[in-house]
Amino acid sequence: MSPGLAPTRTLSTVLRAIRDFSPVSRSALVKETGLTHAAVSRAVATLSREEILVERRLADTMEPRRTRGLALNGDYGYALGIEYSAVGLRGITLDLANRRLGAIQESVDLGGRSRSERVSLIADFSARLLEASRSAPGRCLGIGLVDPGIVDSGRGVALTSSLLDDWNDVPISEAVSSRCGLPVRLLGTGIAKVKGVDRMELERPAHDLLYIEYGDGIACGMKLNGRYVTGSTNSAGELGHLKVVTQEPKPCRCGGLGCLEAHAALPAIVRRCQEALAANSRSVLSGAASLDGRAVLEAASRHDLLARLVVEEAFEMVGTAIAGVVSITNPRVLVLDGTFGAAGDEIRDHLLRVIRRSTLPDHWSALKIQFSGSDAYLGCAGGAVDLVDSLLEY
């Protein structure tokens, strides 16, 4: 079998259906793929000989009767997913069946390092994760690398980032591939996390899905009509750089003015609180030796008046922006970053009210909203999933 797992279109079709609906019977594969029984049987036989599939006596997820269910063989191999940011690196090992085999993280000030130092640190971390995964069954299939900015996935180049200075046109995939001797896929945070949510958190992959990331940046990962949306230059979903209406537009690290990220992301709410504290506003935050966005959200959840005011204003802007994306894309499922929940149930409900009042009734009635779990490795998982997805394509 070739480095990819699907050297023919038929094998790719069968593998992707098994990925999405496993454990699944041959008859259900015929219904799902539109292939003939003979074509499905030949494909399954080929993939079974290569030990890419396993077959168990299970209740089929697509049929009520008990039958033999086909699934991807987790022991065939594994993928690494690595996400880096201004404050550190995280890595995860997922097998072919999306089972988590291990994870590591390191806190390091990447934001304060030079470009060459960052590249070396990321490549070295990748090598350490690979070494830590050697005991996993099968072989390492490759690495999915998740960058906090805008990327050119085709060339494996980090184009720019509002969160990392001097991070322009960096051939980071080549550096990691050379260090580890493996194929590397590069993708942005938004698309990585929507893939992570779609495969790791939802009961079944969604047909139309939005994932809203909220942290140092703000991004929107999209899956529409069953396909992940990356845009013509792989930079779709930059929700944080939507211009918001404000009388005093703040400068954004992207070079623009009035970006949502500059007014409502975690660093922005920290800055707002610091300005208010400097003007002698009362708050439980006034005695903090250092202040971060999570602390502001948690203070708001404890009904601190300053934190609550700042967070509600930020969520007003974020909720309005989310509603705009919902109006344009009409998704079935909207998943919100679990970080929103740190502000407490009352402010979380305020965010939902903002989204609802700015959304068309027909769109709202069709929408299922949930909050993501607090798994810090969600982006890493999406990177590993993306790497495996690429191997299932013809």
Predicted regions: what they are:
Residues D95, S153, K223:
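Short, acidic, Ser/Thr-enriched surface-loop or helix-capping motifs
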Residues M1-R56, M62-R66, A71-S107, G111-R139, ...:
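ATP-binding/phosphotransfer module of carbohydrate and carboxylate kinases, centering on a glycine-rich
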Residues R100-D208, E346-R357:
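Glycine-rich phosphate-binding loop and adjoining helix at the ATP-binding site
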Residues I150-S153, I191-V194, A219-C220, V229, ...:
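Short, active-site-adjacent cap segments at secondary-structure transitions
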Residues A79-E83, G91, C140-G144, L209-E213, ...:
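Short glycine-aspartate micro-motif
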Residues D147, E213, G338:
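Short beta-strand/turn micro-motifs composed of small residues
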Residues A103-Q105, G112-R118, W167-N168, I172-S301:
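Glycine/GP-enriched mid-protein hinge/lid loop-to-helix segment characteristic of carbohydrate kinases
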